[in-house]
Amino acid sequence: MIKRKKIALIGAGSIGGMIAYLVRSRNLGDVVLLDVNGGIAKGKALDIAESSPVAKHNGEILGTNNYADIEGADAIIVTAGISRKPGMSRDDLINTNVHVIKEVAENIAKYAPNAFVVVVTNPLDIMVLAMHKYSHLPSNMVVGMAGVLDAARFSYFIAKELNVSVDSVSSIVLGGHGDFMLPLVKYSSVGGISIADLVKMNLITQDRVNEIIEKTRKGGEEIVNLLKVGSAYYAPAESALLMVDSYLNDRRLMLSCSVYLKGEYGVHDLFVGVPVIIGKNGVEKVIELQLTEEEKNVFNDSVMSIRKLVSNI
């Protein structure tokens, strides 16, 4: 019998609960759904389990508040922490969420030190740095989910603007998960044609592209303001799970993720969003793209915005 993969989800809120359902519905492995509020974790796990006869899910799902239950997990997705409310920035969450991540990291180090860890908690680039600091896991095994989601939003807005299938659009977003993120127009394409060339072909204006870039930067905020309570969870859940899937199944997808840089892009000792290849060894390669001077300036502004917050951890 082939042993199923074990996927632990730390935080049973909207994103954690959605990921638990997606893992089960796609038969990606057994699930441990952990939350400090054990009742929420157990209730959602039971609800998902009871859907299996109808949805034909296989595998086990456990709801718990005991970190010992994550022992031996192959992959862990961390969504624990408070989420944004209308009027809040991602950075407003730092003080509370750093303490949450510290506790999570120490328990991951104790019970699942060989796991591949994806951090979703905001402010993302600071929380993934805290995870690395307090867990002492190798840097190639700790990543943050940012660019996959940001690229998905950018791709969706471009597809809607051009009235094409989202399957035709591919995009790359660099930098921090915030106002200084950098969607790269020349490396983003529709049907293999770069968006920069689409502008030259008069299929979309540069002004409209700039508006879409700004809309992408504000994508999470727009959803927060519409929901009033809580933040986005469908797209973040899909994005985090894609990263875990690439690791567990050695798909070697090139994805934009917040990873620890050791001189790439001129950055040292920070987690910043860049394209990487994720395979069975975690982050297997950082892809260094050629940037224009303007792009370098925006990227460096993004790096500086992250570095200013590092003292908080």
From Swiss-Prot:
TM region positions: none
Family named by the database record: Belongs to the LDH/MDH superfamily. MDH type 3 family.
Native source species: Ehrlichia chaffeensis (strain ATCC CRL-10679 / Arkansas)
Functional note: Catalyzes the reversible oxidation of malate to oxaloacetate.
Keywords: NAD, Oxidoreductase, Tricarboxylic acid cycle
Entry EC no(s): 1.1.1.37
Keyword Oxidoreductase: yes
Catalytic site: 177 (proton acceptor)
Binding residues annotated for NAD(+), in chain numbering: 11-16, 35, 97, 120-122
Binding site for substrate: 84, 90, 122, 153
Protein name per its UniProtKB record: Malate dehydrogenase
InterPro entries assigned: L-lactate/malate_DH, Lactate/malate_DH_C, Lactate/malate_DH_N, Lactate_DH/Glyco_Ohase_4_C, Malate_DH_type3, NAD(P)-bd_dom_sf
